[in-house]
Amino acid sequence: MALRHKSAQKRHRQSLKRRAINRAKKSTIKTFSKKALVAAQGGAEDATAMQQRAESLIDKAAKGSTLHKNAAARKKSRLAKAINKAKAAQQA
């Protein structure tokens, strides 16, 4: 980082803040996705609500450009597929 340029110092500070915020959002998405999947595998009734919460967080991250829109769609699709598979296994 260039120590002589105030604007470069400020941009660096801002990038560190954004990185922390983005990492926290991605971590929350992973946590809620895992909780939804575990709930579906365990046959919990609130698995659908957890899935909706995870998908909402994914959409918000994509809206704020933390995630690319295609990456968000892929995560939602894979989560739904895994949860549906777990629910089908519970019923069988």
UniProtKB/Swiss-Prot annotation:
One of its GO terms (molecular function) is small ribosomal subunit rRNA binding. GO terms for cellular component: small ribosomal subunit. SUPFAM superfamilies: Ribosomal protein S20. InterPro entries: Ribosomal_bS20, Ribosomal_bS20_sf. Keywords: Ribonucleoprotein, Ribosomal protein, RNA-binding, rRNA-binding. Residues 1-25, 68-92 are annotated as: Disordered. NCBIfam families: S20. This is Small ribosomal subunit protein bS20. The lineage of its organism: Bacteria, Thermotogati, Deinococcota, Deinococci, Deinococcales. The gene is rpsT.
